[in-house]
């Protein structure tokens, strides 16, 4: 019985360690990626997985060694896995609508800093101009789609 307890504790430790490694990779991605959208992708996907692995490892460890099942850990796991992607989606959507800089592959050879592209200026006026242009395009597509749906209904 003691051997099984040790094996399950080892599995829990491995899960916690993997969660820590994935959190480290997430932190590196946040620092290395070029724009808001890539950074949000790195932070959301991998941090959600790292929290999942870490909390499951802790839950298993406490169940085996203490015989203690924590509803708080389970609720925190559910809460984080539901709210983290939704929150980051809202942040990314707000950044997109405000005209935040988007990294492009052709910027890679000419890019001098992480935040700015040499092709375009990221002054507040330019950002507002791009956001307005995106909104106009979105409205045109929305109305075309609405007309198409109305035509199909008739």
UniProtKB/Swiss-Prot annotation:
Membrane-traversing stretches: 11-31, 51-71, 72-92
Pfam families: PhaG_MnhG_YufB (PF03334)
Localization (cell): Cell membrane
Keyword Ion transport belongs to the record: yes
Record's keyword terms, sorted: Antiport, Cell membrane, Ion transport, Membrane, Transmembrane, Transmembrane helix, Transport
MF annotations from Gene Ontology: sodium:proton antiporter activity
Location (main, coarse): membrane
Top-level taxon of origin: Bacteria
Lipid bilayer topology: Multi-pass membrane protein
GO cellular component, one term: plasma membrane
Subunit structure: May form a heterooligomeric complex that consists of seven subunits: mnhA2, mnhB2, mnhC2, mnhD2, mnhE2, mnhF2 and mnhG2.
Protein family (similarity comment): Belongs to the CPA3 antiporters (TC 2.A.63) subunit G family.
NCBIfam families xrefs: CPA3_mnhG_phaG, PRK12586.1
UniProt xrefs under PANTHER family: ANTIPORTER SUBUNIT MNHG2-RELATED
Protein name listed in UniProt: Putative antiporter subunit mnhG2
Lineage: Bacteria, Bacillati, Bacillota, Bacilli, Bacillales
Gene designation per UniProt: mnhG2
């Amino acid at each position: 019985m003691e051997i099984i307890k040790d094996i399950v504790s080892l599995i829990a430790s491995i899960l916690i360690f993997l969660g820590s490694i994935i959190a480290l990779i997430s932190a590196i991605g946040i620092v290395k990626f070029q724009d808001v959208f890539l950074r949000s992708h790195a932070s959301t996907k991998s941090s959600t997985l790292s929290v999942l692995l870490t909390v499951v490892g802790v839950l298993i460890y406490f169940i085996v060694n203490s015989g203690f099942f924590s509803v708080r850990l389970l609720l925190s796991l559910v809460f984080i896995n539901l709210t983290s992607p939704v929150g980051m989606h809202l942040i990314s959507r707000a950044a997109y609508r405000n005209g935040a800089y988007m990294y492009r592959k052709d910027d890679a050879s000419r890019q001098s800093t992480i935040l700015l592209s040499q092709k375009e200026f990221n002054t507040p006026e330019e950002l507002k101009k791009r956001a307005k242009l995106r909104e106009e395009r979105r409205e045109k597509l929305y109305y075309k789609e609405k007309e198409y749906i109305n035509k199909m209904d008739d």
